[in-house]
From Swiss-Prot:
Protein function: This protein is located at the 30S-50S ribosomal subunit interface and may play a role in the structure and function of the aminoacyl-tRNA binding site.
Highest taxon of the lineage: Bacteria
Lineage, uppermost ranks: Bacteria, Pseudomonadati, Campylobacterota, Epsilonproteobacteria, Campylobacterales
Listed name of the protein: Large ribosomal subunit protein bL19
Family: Belongs to the bacterial ribosomal protein bL19 family.
Length: 118
C-alpha cells in the first residue's frame, strides 16, 4: 500500500498528460523532444509496440523498428515522459499475445503483423 501523499502526487501526474489508447502490435510514431545545448528539436521514431508493462506513473512501453542495415532498434519509453512530444497510432495490429518478443528472431516478411480491418 502506498503512502497517501505519494498516491496524490502520482494521480496529479496522470491527469496532466493524455495518451492515445494502443496495445502490443500497433505501429506507433513517437515524437521525442531532444535538447542539444540551448536548442530543442523533435526527432521521430516509428516502430511496432512489442510490450507494455507496469501501471500508473511507472507504466512503460517498448517500441521496435528495423534500422539501417537490417539492425533492430528497441527503445523503452515511460508513458508519462516529458520527452514524448507526440504519440500517434499509425496501424492497429491483430496479435494474440501481450508481449511480442518473438519478433526479435523474425526477419523480413516473417516479422509482419496483420492489420485489423474495420
Amino acid at each position: 500500500m502506498k503512502n497517501r501523499y505519494i498516491q496524490q502526487f502520482e494521480d496529479a501526474q496522470l491527469k496532466d498528460k493524455t495518451m492515445p489508447i494502443f496495445k502490443a502490435g500497433d505501429t506507433l510514431k513517437l515524437g521525442i523532444t531532444i535538447k542539444e545545448g540551448e536548442k530543442t528539436r523533435t526527432q521521430y521514431f516509428e516502430g511496432v509496440c512489442i510490450a507494455i508493462r507496469g501501471n500508473g506513473v511507472d507504466k512503460t512501453f517498448c517500441v521496435r523498428k528495423i534500422g539501417a542495415n537490417n539492425i533492430g532498434v528497441e527503445k523503452i519509453f515511460p508513458f508519462y515522459s516529458e520527452s514524448l512530444a507526440s504519440v500517434e497510432v499509425l496501424r492497429v495490429g491483430r496479435v494474440r499475445r501481450a508481449k511480442l518478443y518473438y519478433l526479435r528472431d523474425r526477419r523480413g516478411k516473417a516479422a509482419r503483423i496483420k492489420e485489423v480491418r474495420h
